[in-house]
């Protein structure tokens, strides 16, 4: 909890600073060192996100089933600018003994709303948390980032 408060406080300070001062995008990005980004991302990696609740999968002998969840409303903050990034996350997996309860999966995604996290780290965090909760036979995470600055980004984990 302390880590989340630290991150939110830092984001608020950055937003307050942005309101008070005129700046160019270049100046804003240059204020943040790669060391600061690394420290911030390491703190986020340790954060305990809401649990993804699970239910028993009653057809575990069916090893060929593939389940796909797509959530087009995932929002997280860009750690460089504080601007919200919008994602479509797709989870493609082969179930083992458990499946996620979808309401808890949605609340899990909503918890990222105020977190400053890099795209690549977000895909890995979702993958790690989903594996830990659901223990799938196979898992693929696709994170499609809304186009920003003319660059289309897709992370596949």
Show which residues each predicted segment covers.
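N-terminal intrinsically disordered, cationic/polar leader segments
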Residues: 14-157
């Amino acid at each position: 909890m302390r880590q989340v408060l630290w991150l939110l406080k830092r984001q608020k300070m950055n937003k307050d600073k942005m309101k008070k001062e005129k700046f160019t995008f270049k100046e804003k990005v240059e204020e943040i060192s790669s060391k600061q980004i690394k420290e911030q991302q390491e703190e986020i990696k340790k954060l305990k996100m809401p649990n993804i609740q699970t239910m028993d999968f009653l057809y575990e002998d069916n090893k060929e089933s593939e389940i796909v969840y797509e959530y087009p409303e995932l929002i997280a903050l860009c750690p460089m600018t504080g601007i919200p990034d919008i994602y479509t996350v797709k989870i493609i997996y082969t179930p083992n003994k458990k499946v996620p309860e979808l309401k808890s999966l949605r609340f899990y995604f909503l918890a990222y709303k105020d977190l400053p996290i890099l795209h690549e780290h977000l895909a890995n965090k979702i993958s790690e948390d989903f594996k830990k909760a659901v223990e799938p036979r196979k898992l693929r995470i696709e994170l499609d980032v809304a186009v920003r600055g003319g660059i289309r980004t897709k992370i596949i984990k």
